[in-house]
């Protein structure tokens, strides 16, 4: 039985890391709209949960991963269709897991952790809980589930004003420190993503 769920892009089901480790629930028939090149993000996120960092020696999670694909658009950016409210989409997906839908049985009532990527670059946090945040709080309480919420993908470039040769000469750990410092120095522009 699945213990972890992800609401994100459609993965490649037969990827070497993911084969026989996923339970994909696609009640909206999104599979037909996802081409192979559109499945990179979903595959990467599912692989990260199932196996951890690809370079680490982490063991596979012991149970299958429940996957509820979300819509994607031709620009390959996460989005919610114009005729859908995000709160409705999330509510329907989670309720289907624990209570079922259309007189069907629940599809993943054993899930205790739900990974969700919901960044909205047009709506910054201003110290008031959004309707979606309230919904997640209520769903968490009602179904006794933990939501792991990612702020979403960052499409802005991260600029480095230093010398390219210097950067390339650094080892990986030094590059990561420089990269992270650069992000933290620019956090005023990413309030939604990085809190103080």
Language-model segments: which ranges?
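Subtilisin-like serine protease catalytic core
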Residues: 1-26, 32-86, 125, 144, ...
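Substrate-binding/access-modulating region of protease and related hydrolase catalytic domains
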Residues: 74-194
